[in-house]
């Protein structure tokens, strides 16, 4: 870790600006170069199509006006440099850049953005609980779920039962691509009303006659059989507040805080005491200290500091469980033991054994790989259940069973039920068969862990039926592989792409042959030379993900990567992916996992951490658990930088 702390300074830059005094910092020099040299080029030649009213390819240069802005978009500049040097941008109908301007852009990119820099944690930012985090936090706080009626749940393909997720608006993905990246999503008055409704619903259920066990746990006492909530005593109310408050705040609370909450309850009895108790509990649940993460940590304006153990417990629990810290984490935070590296490793191991760790696959995995797209694509509930749950169970297996990271691509273990059994050829005979009730055509059947033997065309996430169904054509499949698995940045395609022309009269061209003609445009070819070999490698699978068995009629699935590596079919491509492309796949896995864990878009200052973790995982054929341990012990996870002026 010490190597991550060594400082690497920017080189002086494109030009030596003679009027600068020699004592000016490299950082100031870099800022002057961008603002005085590169920014005018962007404004003159790029902003017309990539800024203000028109934003092509999701690239907005109007928001990049300083070196700091440029640093925050570090992934963008490789593509920008590529298209400029290949004469693909500016487009033909715009004045081209001069040779001198191209040299300036290239030199600036190489010297300013490729120079190693110091590893730093992210800026301290409180984050609102996402919808799933809020639901899980309520559940672990009270011991029960708030659910909608069964009839309402059955109206959706997902069968969503959670009242929380039904009522709260869906969180949009943040800049990181994940919905837990909520810093820029404030709480509106309408959403606050919904939180109030949910708080009332939870409290009414807590004090209902059927919830005695949860109430007894909070009171820390056994209640008489004929006890009624209106008969609550002062001692019982105090026990509830003392138990509830630190669990809701996610850190142990001082006696002063507890006494202030208890003051309005004193001298009250019976129904009045119950009403006052509910009011105080609701106030806690509507407090920013409950709805946001990180508000209670001590602040040190202008400093880089380790986060306290309670913040570390929150980061750990919402990363691995999407839920509040349990009693074990709270106790370790209180004793100051949690920040020790060996303790964190032990807790990762413990937490991955908990059923709560399924959230890593259901939330992180689904968002990373775009699996939720199946919700819109497959409307039939039985098929949806099979195609969507199979990759989730596979990811859960990788994450929780200490499996190598690269098994994401190649694994003999899968999960099957009758809904996907038909995709596995002769291996189907070894699968468990479930009898269905008479009169019912199809029904959901349970999944089982299964070892592949003869279905060699399966194995790993890429060839799962749901993934192939979700990406039905070679361009979709190639784009998904590049973006989600290899982590290659691709701009959005132009809006005015002409349709693929049919075969000329007298020629029976395949789709691939017709597409070769279609993509002859130079600006398209740059991306398609990366996309097409990967996408067409999967042409032996039809639009539903079924493997084509007729060897005499198989389409051409061969290809050549930009690296020069050739393959005849996906089986050969898979071998390339797990060997020469392994580091790239591991690096993207590290990048996506760290971004999810930190609930933010990564910056240039995270790259040394990604480099180090990737190196360790590749060298040791590391597992997903190794990756998680590396992340929770990393600089970005354990530390933060406080701004000079802190809001809130």
Language model: regions and residue ranges:
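A conserved hydrophobic secondary-structure block that centers on an alpha-helix together
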Residues: 228-280
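Extended, hydrophobic alpha-helical segments in both membrane/secreted and soluble proteins
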Residues: 257, 261, 288-293, 312, ...
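Sequence context surrounding c-type heme c attachment/ligation sites in exported
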Residues: 28-79, 86-88, 93-97, 421, ...
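Extended surface/linker regions that mediate inter-domain or inter-protein docking
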Residues: 108, 133, 141-142, 183-214, ...
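Hydrophobic h-region of N-terminal signal peptides that target proteins for export
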Residues: 15-26
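Structural motif
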Residues: 231-236, 269-279, 302-312, 352-360, ...
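Bacterial N-terminal signal peptides that target proteins for export
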Residues: 2-14
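Aromatic- and Gly/Pro-enriched helix-to-coil junctions and flexible linker segments
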Residues: 25-222, 247, 251-254, 258-263, ...
């Amino acid at each position: 870790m010490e190597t991550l702390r060594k400082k690497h300074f920017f080189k002086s830059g494109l030009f030596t600006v003679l009027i600068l005094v020699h004592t000016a910092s490299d950082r100031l020099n870099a800022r002057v170069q961008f603002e005085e040299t590169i920014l005018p080029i962007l404004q003159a030649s790029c902003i017309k199509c990539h800024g203000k009213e028109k934003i092509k390819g999701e690239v907005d240069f109007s928001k990049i006006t300083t070196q700091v802005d440029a640093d925050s978009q570090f992934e963008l500049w490789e593509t920008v440099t590529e298209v400029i040097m290949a004469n693909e941008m500016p487009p033909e109908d715009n004045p081209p850049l001069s040779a001198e301007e191209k040299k300036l852009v290239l030199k600036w990119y190489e010297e300013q953005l490729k120079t190693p820099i110091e590893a730093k944690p992210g800026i301290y930012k409180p984050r609102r609980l996402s919808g799933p985090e809020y639901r899980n936090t309520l559940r672990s706080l009270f011991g029960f779920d708030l659910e909608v009626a069964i009839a309402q749940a059955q109206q959706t393909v997902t069968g969503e039962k959670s009242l929380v997720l039904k009522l709260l608006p869906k969180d949009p993905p943040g800049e990181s691509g994940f919905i837990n990246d909520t810093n820029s999503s404030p709480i509106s008055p309408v959403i606050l009303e919904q939180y109030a409704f949910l708080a009332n619903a939870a409290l009414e259920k807590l004090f209902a006659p059927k919830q005695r066990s949860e109430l007894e746990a909070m009171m820390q006492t056994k209640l008489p059989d004929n006890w009624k909530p209106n008969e609550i005593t002062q001692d019982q109310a105090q026990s509830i507040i003392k138990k509830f408050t630190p669990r809701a705040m996610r850190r142990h609370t001082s006696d002063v805080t507890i006494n202030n909450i208890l003051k309005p309850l004193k001298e009250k009895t019976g129904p009045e005491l119950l009403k006052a108790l509910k009011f105080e509990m609701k106030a806690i649940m509507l407090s920013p200290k409950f709805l946001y993460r990180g508000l209670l940590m001590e602040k040190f304006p202008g400093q880089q500091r380790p986060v306290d153990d309670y913040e570390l417990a929150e980061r750990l629990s919402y990363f691995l469980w999407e839920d509040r810290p349990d009693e074990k984490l709270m106790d370790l935070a209180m004793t100051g033991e949690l920040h020790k590296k060996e303790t964190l490793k032990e807790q990762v191991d413990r937490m991955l054994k908990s059923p709560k760790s399924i959230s890593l696959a259901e939330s992180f995995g689904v968002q990373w790989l775009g699996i939720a797209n199946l919700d819109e694509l497959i409307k039939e509930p039985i098929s949806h259940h099979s195609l969507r749950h199979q990759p989730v169970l596979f990811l859960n297996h990788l994450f929780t069973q200490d499996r190598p990271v690269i098994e994401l691509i190649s694994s003999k273990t899968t999960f099957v039920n009758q809904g996907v059994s038909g995709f596995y050829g002769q291996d189907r005979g070894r699968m468990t068969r479930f009898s269905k009730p008479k009169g019912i055509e199809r029904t959901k059947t349970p999944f089982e862990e299964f070892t592949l033997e003869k279905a060699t065309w399966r194995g790993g996430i890429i060839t799962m039926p749901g993934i192939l169904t979700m990406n039905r054509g070679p361009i979709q499949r190639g784009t998904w592989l590049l973006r989600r698995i290899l982590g290659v940045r691709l701009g959005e395609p132009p809006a005015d792409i002409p349709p693929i022309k049919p075969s000329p009269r007298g020629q029976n061209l395949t789709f691939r042959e017709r597409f070769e003609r279609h993509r002859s445009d130079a600006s398209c070819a740059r991306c398609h030379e990366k996309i097409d070999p990967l996408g067409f490698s999967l042409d032996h699978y039809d639009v539903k993900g079924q493997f084509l068995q007729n060897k005499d009629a198989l389409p051409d699935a061969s290809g050549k990567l930009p690296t020069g590596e050739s393959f005849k079919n996906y089986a050969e491509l898979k071998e390339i992916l797990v060997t020469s492309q392994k580091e790239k796949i591991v690096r993207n896995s590290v990048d996506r996992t760290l971004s999810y864990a930190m609930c933010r878009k990564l910056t240039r200052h995270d790259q040394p951490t990604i480099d180090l973790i990737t190196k360790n995982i590749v060298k040791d054929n590391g597992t997903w658990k190794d990756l998680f341990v590396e992340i929770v012990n990393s600089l970005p996870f354990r530390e933060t930088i406080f701004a000079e002026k802190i809001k809130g």
